[in-house]
Every structure is written in C-alpha cells, then in structure tokens.
Amino acid sequence: SSDLSACFILSVDDSMESILNWYREEGFIFKGGSGAGLNISRIRSSKELLSSGGTASGPVSFMRGADASAGTIKSGGATRRAAKMVVLDIDHPDIEEFIETKAREEDKIRALRDAGFDMDLGGRDIVSVQYQNANNSVRVSDAFMTAVEQGQPFGLTSRTEPGKVLDTVDAKELFGKIAQAAWECADPGLQYDDTINAWHTTPNSGRINASNPCSEYMSLDNSSCNLASLNLLKFLDEDDHFDVGRFTKAVELVITAMDISICFADFPTEAICETTRNFRQLGIGYANLGALLMALGLGYDSDGGRALAAAITSLMTGVSYRRSAELAAIVGPYAGYAENTEPHQAVMIKHRDANRQVHPLHDNDTTVLTAAKAEWDKVVKLGRTNGFRNAQASVLAPTGTIGFMMDCDTTGIEPDFSLVKFKKMVGGGSMQIVNQTVPRALKNLGYTPEQAEKIIAYISDNGSVVGAPVLDEAHYEVFDCAMGTRFIAPMGHVRMMAAV
C-alpha cells in the first residue's frame, strides 16, 4: 500500500504542542510530494495575552516557521515543490497583518533585486525572503460581505474569549486591502465560508474550515482526497459531438476505482486515516475545458461556452454521486453517513435543483444537460434508498502538472494562455507553434481548408486573430485567450467559475 492522496486538510489548535505537530505533519506530507492546507484561526492573536502573562506571537509569526520548513524540504530533494494553503478567518484580530504579509515580502524582493541580489525564482538570495511557500486565503463570511456593501464597521473577535470584540475596522477599507494585496502579489484569495458550509454534506461531523493548497477540495479537518481528472477533448466524437455515453462510463469506472483505492492506501497520520476511511472523499474532475470550447467554436467568455461547461460539470458530478449510491447498495454507505443522512440528501437536492437553472443554447449542451437531469433524478432517488458510499465525489483541480502528461492544451477550467506558443528545442533555440485547437475550431465555424490555412498563417505572424483575412469578426471571441490583444476580461474568468 502507499499514500494515494495528494491533498490533505490539517488542523491546528491554540497550543505550542499543536503548532509544533502542525510543522511535523506538514513535513511528512511534503516529503511524500503531497500538499496540505489548514485554518490557523484558532491560534490566539498578537493582541492577546498568554497564560504566563506575556503577549502572544500570533498566527502570522508561526506561519514563518511552517514556511521555512516547507522551503527547506522542497530544496532537500523532493520531487516537487511543497504545496501549502494557509487560511485565516476575516474576524481574526491579526487579519490585516495576514493580508499584507506576502505583499510586503514582494516589496523586499524588489528592493533587494535593485540592490543587486539574485532574487529570481530559485536564485541564491530568494531563500531569505519569507512566506514564499504557501497560498494564503481569507475566510470571509456573509456578514462581512454585507458590511462591505453597506460600508459598516466590522468586529475582530478574541480567540481566548469567544465573542469579545477586540478591535473594530471599516469593512470596505479592509476589503480594499485584500484587493490591493491580491493585485500586487496574487494573494490572499477568498473563501466564502457560509456558501461553502451551506453545500457541506457532513456538517454534523464538523464544519469546513479550510481547503487543500489549490482550494478545489474543501472538507473536514484532518481529511484527505485522491484526485483524478479526465481530458474533455478526448470525448468529442468524429462529428465533434460530446460523447455522453463514453464520458458517463469513464466517470463510473474512475469513481469505482478511486473508492477501492481508499481501502489499500496509507495515510500520513492516524487522524487523517480515520477521517478518510469514515468519509471516503473522492475528487474526480476534468482538464482541457478551454481547448474543448475553442474546438467547438464557442467563446470561453460566452453564454454558449458557459452553458456547455456547466452541463458537463453537472453531468460528471451527477454520475459520480449516482455511482456512489450504487456502490453503497453493495458495500454500504460511508461510516459517517448515518450521522449526516439528512444534510447529505439535502445537498443532493440542491445540486439537482441547481442543474435545472442551466439553460442550453446548442445541441451539445442540450444533450449533456438532458443526461445530467436524468442522473440527478437518479441520485436523489437512489440516495434515499441506499445512502452514499462517499461524502464527496468531485472537485475541479487546476491539473497544473498532470495536464501536460494528459496531452492537454489547457489546464483545469482555464482558457488557453495564448494562440501562439514557443517550444524550446533540445539543441537550443525555439519553435513557434500555433495552438493546435485553432484548425479544429475554424473547421467547426465553417471555414474551408484554404481559408483556415490563411488565418493560421496570419496568427503565426501576428499572434492574434484581429485583422486575419476572411475571418468573420463575430468569431473573434472564440479565439480569446488569457493573454494577447483580445484577452479575456477579469469577469469572464469569474463568470466561468460561477458556471461550473
């Protein structure tokens, strides 16, 4: 047996023993090439006293030790970089320090680089900069977001005396600091606590406090998830119709195999082993969505693109839970199901109802959505009879590493980065390659091979479709990418995340 999970959620309490155990557990997880996330909000703030009478260090200071440990293990011969997620609740008294931590370190990097130090990624001097080995996220509540909208004050509360307000801040100003820091250094991210827990299948066993490093897996503390992703482009048939039957069979097979794998897996701690065996969380997902949409002649930031993405995601999750209910009929539901029967079934009904809000626009999404509707009806019906084998079934991972092994043009739910890429050659130099999805897209949009050849030659020379001969301007949106002359607007990315 071996450790088959790549994603873990840990926990840490307000004690030195727990904090040092956090370092230890992360160390062993990183050594195995996996990643972990946790919420550090239970640790008392730097504005509170210790039992001995001194002032506490606060959670941000303890992040420094964990960050250094991750950086050391990463450089000690591990096969991949340590992956960390650190989460802090919006009402923690040290939240402002947490928000600005990485942005301040970025300022140091620029200053040291200008002074002549080697601050490039992997440079000899970059190791002296702190907080470079983790993703940081702020857990925001509905109450905080309402305060932001209404320009109201927001209370930061004690960890040692729950409910006691230690400081009051301007919610809109604090949100502005989050946005500014994210603009400067891409951190912190946001995790919407109330929404996350509203879709939680096992709330009677504990709330969701944190995520794995990439944020796709959100579940109980001290839990794990094994991931598997499907290459969506491989499910287009010869006529470029999405093959619902093959996709359904693939999801059934992978979910079954993933559930079996839990029985044979090792885990880094006893607590994680117990939680995973009791709740059997799985994480099937997909990659190459951006390439799929382009190949079909659908803009990433278009209603048609979002409709198909939503339909495929719904079908995948519906098939996953339906197979989970079928497995439960044979080998029994997960051990924690009895305690969470009502909330788990309620979340399945929410999924079914949400699926009904998706409106198809083309043949492909109509076919997929019809299948998804049938699957969700089965999920609700079978779940009432059999229960479920797994507390969770699907996630949408970024597939940043495995996507390339799977021959994907795009990773996770991302659009294509650019229409033209440069491939480094073994003997030196580079070769320019036009995105391989472009010819397929032009064919589906009705262009002849001769017209397509002219358009591709133009893209190769100019890196953009703008002004390409014979290309209808109405089709420009199909070729919009993350970068370039016609880059996808920020809300285009947000709308796609909302759709899936």
Where are these regions (language model features)?
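Active-site cavity-forming subdomains of large catalytic enzyme subunits
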Residues: S5-K249, I260-T275, L298, A309, ...
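Short, electropositive, low-hydrophobicity segments enriched in small/polar residues
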Residues: S41, F62, L190, L232, ...
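General structural signal for alpha-helix termini and helix-helix connectors
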Residues: S75, L233-L236, F267, A295-G299, ...
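Composition- and surface-driven signal marking solvent-exposed, interaction-prone regions
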Residues: T101-K102, D193-I196, P203-R207, D303-A309, ...
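Catalytic alpha/beta core of large soluble enzyme barrels
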Residues: E216, M258, I262-C263, A329, ...
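Helical catalytic core of nucleic-acid polymerases
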Residues: V251-A287, A291-S324, G428-E473
